[in-house]
Amino acid sequence: DKKEPDMFLLSECKAPEENEKINLGCLVIGSQPLKISWEPKKSSIVEHVFPSEMRNGNYTMVLQVTVLASELNLNHTCTINKPKRKEKPFKFPESWDSQSSKRVTPTLQAKNHSTEATKAITTKKDIEGAMAPSNLTVNILTTSTHPEMSSWLLCEVSGFFPENIHLMWLGVHSKMKSTNFVTANPTAQPGGTFQTWSVLRLPVALSSSLDTYTCVVEHEASKTKLNASKSLAISGCYHLLPESDGPSRRPDGPALA
């Protein structure tokens, strides 16, 4: 029998204002062609399915929806309709309850030559016991063989406490639009710290002529900013998808809540 597809629900790390729109994502990985949808169907919900890609026998598909924050009280559900029906409801991240409505605007700029993670100087901590994120990586997730298809970058960060953290992506000259990426809710890891990840959809397939992309991480509690970059001219890809057996989990870590 074919293994059931893995489903991962994604949301922005920061709680939205009541009048704002927010992006939610559903990442599905399975051994068979997939068909996924989002419920409920409403004219105010903008739905976009990124083209399915296959790598090492696994199909990967991302469904992204943009919804009004005021409508998050609805029963939002990601549903796999093919090959076998399976659904997963969206749940509010616990971290949203503790977040202030005030937002922080990152001031970091992308550096074309940067290919390693760089850490800003950590100043006095506002929260007792706060731990700055220590591990940040950006890797190529998949590479399409067709120009009309998209490629993906995966940014992973871990070792931080408390869990409130902000991730964003930069191109060479400007910040990437939030409609181009989705970020997972932070999950606990051994030692009382947290980890999270973000997937960026690139507008075109990988090419040596394309630019460098930078993942920026802001952890306000520890007054820490990190950034890591990946040049698309670097050859080779990283296989970060889960194996065909075993329990459901995120591409490189424990299951999402």
From Swiss-Prot:
Q: Where do the record's region annotations for Disordered lie?
A: 89-111
Q: Name one Pfam family in it.
A: C1-set
Question: Mainly resides where?
Answer: secreted
What's any one GO cellular component for it?
Answer: extracellular region
Q: Which residues are glycosylated?
A: 58, 75, 112, 135, 227
Q: What is this protein called?
A: Ig delta chain C region secreted form
Q: Where in the cell is it found?
A: Secreted
Q: List the disulfide bonds.
A: 26-78
Secreted as a keyword of this entry, yes or no, is: yes
**Species name:** Mus musculus (Mouse)
* Record Gene3D superfamilies: Immunoglobulins
Its keywords, alphabetically, are: Disulfide bond, Glycoprotein, Immunoglobulin domain, Repeat, Secreted
For the keyword Repeat, the answer is: yes
**Domain of life of the source:** Eukaryota
Question: What are the Ig-like domain coordinates in residue numbering?
Answer: 5-105, 133-233
Biased segments, Polar residues type: 96-111
Q: In which tissues is it expressed?
A: Cell lines producing IgD contain several mRNA species for Ig delta chains. In plasmacytomas, the secreted form is the major component, and the membrane-bound form is a minor component. In spleen, however, the membrane-bound form is the major component. These two forms differ in their C-terminal segments.
Also noted in the record is:
This delta chain lacks the domain corresponding to the CH2 domain of human delta chain.
